[in-house]
């Protein structure tokens, strides 16, 4: 949920005017909730309705935030970006395609029987299991989940010889009635047939890297693999961007050198976004909360907001095709 001040910033209105709109329009599905400071909190669905009231909406996109290098924050940033996008009015789905299932562990509602969850293994093994029947409400407002399990490693046996261009694309047709605006694929740090399908199905791929040579090489390989797969299977190349994650002291010479190398190597694909390394983020994940609950450094929140502007931008409805 977001405050009236934050909603006002998105709609270019004052907090007072946001309160007026909430009181004047009973069809916004708003039930007043306040925190301990008596601040009004606006849920995701109400924020989406406010956007529509002002002839605005979230631009629909399918997204990946990952590269072929583990430990650079891909899953954490997927989760934080998904939660923030939902707060801003997006209806968000996170499809966990990583057998490690960290996104599932974080998002899974406490009262759900995990043993009954259908994952990509069952979805691709049995055509009678449609994707819409696998969607769960997560613990976070406006965020939904298709879960993963460790056994999902076996799914690759089902996909031998399959065209990755069509694997996920066909399954997504089952979701057309659910009106998701923003879909995230959380992937393992490998280029399997299923993750390949997710990369070339996405509208935008954001590749995080740290300042290490391994991280930079992972981003480079991921970009090359996506482009080669798109050429091989005659798929449109998604928008591919690279950004610096887990950035330590930016005054250090090694970080500056890495940044300059990234800019030279990736050119216009390099985003001017640096996600700072902060214990607040680790603590939030370990506590099962987002960085927008409780204490977290503002520079981290601001950097995540920049990612949200890319994967879930808000535009005039007339500009959205």
Residue ranges of predicted features:
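P-loop NTP-binding core
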Residues: 3-5, 9-10, 15-16, 20-23, ...
């Amino acid at each position: 949920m977001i405050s009236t001040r934050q909603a006002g910033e998105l709609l270019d209105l004052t907090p007072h005017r946001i309160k007026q709109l909430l009181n004047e329009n009973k069809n916004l599905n708003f039930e007043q909730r306040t925190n301990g400071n008596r601040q009004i909190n606006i849920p995701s669905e109400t924020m989406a309705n406010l956007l529509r009231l002002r002839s605005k909406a979230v631009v629909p996109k399918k997204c990946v935030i990952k590269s072929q290098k583990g430990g650079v924050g891909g899953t954490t940033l997927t989760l934080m970006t998904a939660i923030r996008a939902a707060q801003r009015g997006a209806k968000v789905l996170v499809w966990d395609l990583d057998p490690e299932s960290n996104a599932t562990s974080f998002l899974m509602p406490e009262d759900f029987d995990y043993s009954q969850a259908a994952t990509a293994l069952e979805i691709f093994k049995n055509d009678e299991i449609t994707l819409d029947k696998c969607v769960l409400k997560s613990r976070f407002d406006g965020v939904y989940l298709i879960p993963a399990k460790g056994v999902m490693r076996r799914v690759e046996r089902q996909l031998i010889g399959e065209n990755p261009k069509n694997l996920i694309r066909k399954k997504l047709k089952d979701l057309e009635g659910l009106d998701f605006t923003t879909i995230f694929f959380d992937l393992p740090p490998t280029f399997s047939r299923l993750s390949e399908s997710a990369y070339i199905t996405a509208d935008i791929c954001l590749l995080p890297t740290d300042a290490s040579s391994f991280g930079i090489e992972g981003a480079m390989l991921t970009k090359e693999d996506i482009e080669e797969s798109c050429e091989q299977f005659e798929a449109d190349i998604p928008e591919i961007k690279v950004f610096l994650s887990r950035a330590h002291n930016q005054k250090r010479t090694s970080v500056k050198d890495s940044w300059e190398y990234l800019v030279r190597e990736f050119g216009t694909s390099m985003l001017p976004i640096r996600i700072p390394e902060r214990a607040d983020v680790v603590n939030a994940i370990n506590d099962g909360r987002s960085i927008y609950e409780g204490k977290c450094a503002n520079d981290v929140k601001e950097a995540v907001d920049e990612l949200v502007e890319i994967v879930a931008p808000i535009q005039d409805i007339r500009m959205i095709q």
